Regions:
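Mature N-terminal segment immediately following signal peptide/propeptide cleavage
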Residues: 29-63
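Residue-level signature of the cytosolic catalytic core of signaling kinases
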Residues: 28, 32, 41, 72-75, ...
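Active-site-adjacent, His/Asp/Glu-enriched structural segments that form or flank metal-binding
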Residues: 55-57, 65-80, 84-182
Length: 182
């Protein structure tokens, strides 16, 4: 009798688990704020613009690219992250250190207001707290976003300098256990 009861209980649990899957529903998408202007350029870039009054006379610029470590082949591991770093080391319109120098001159601090990250499926660059009343600041930030998406200079000297930065960043992120296992 005990075995029969356990068997029936096991069947009931399995059936409940299967029915739960049948009733699972996909969550509806998050609604887009009606104050967001959305458009698509001829080159396929989708943009989102929203006015924000706080902080006053400041703007944030982001470009999210649908590329990350998931697209890399084994012999390309770390390339997306490396290119993210190279975006700050020279573009067509901002050679060498000119991008960082210009933005810091108008009050955008590297690391705090000027940054990027690479994830599994995206690489996101941001310039925040840009003083919009500074002549040319908005146009320059849009030009920087353009350069980040299409016009890196990839100067061999800058590549060699950044290689050491990437290696050090990787080393410090590894846990002590991972280092011991190598």
């Amino acid at each position: 009798m005990k075995h029969l009861f356990r068997g029936l209980l096991l069947v009931a649990v399995i059936l409940c688990c299967n029915f739960q899957q049948a009733f699972a529903q996909q969550m509806p998408p998050i609604p887009i704020d009606k104050n967001v202007r959305i458009g698509k350029l001829d080159n396929g870039l989708t943009y989102y613009i929203r006015k924000n009054n706080l902080p006053a006379n400041r703007a944030d610029f982001y470009i999210a690219q649908k590329v990350g470590s998931i697209q890399e082949e084994e012999n390309q591991r770390g390339l997306a992250h490396f290119l993210e770093h190279m975006c700050f080391n020279g573009t067509t319109h901002f050679p060498g250190d000119a991008l960082k120098q210009y933005l810091e001159r108008i009050g955008v601090k590297f690391g705090e207001n000027l940054n990027a990250y690479t994830a599994i499926d995206e690489t996101v660059y941001n310039i925040s707290n840009v003083p919009v009343k500074t002549p040319g600041a908005v146009d320059s930030c849009l030009l920087i976003l353009h350069d980040w998406s299409n016009d890196l200079t990839l100067d061999p000297k800058e590549i060699d300098k950044e290689r050491g930065v990437i290696n050090e960043e990787w080393r410090t992120r590894m846990s002590a256990m991972m280092r011991m296992q190598e």
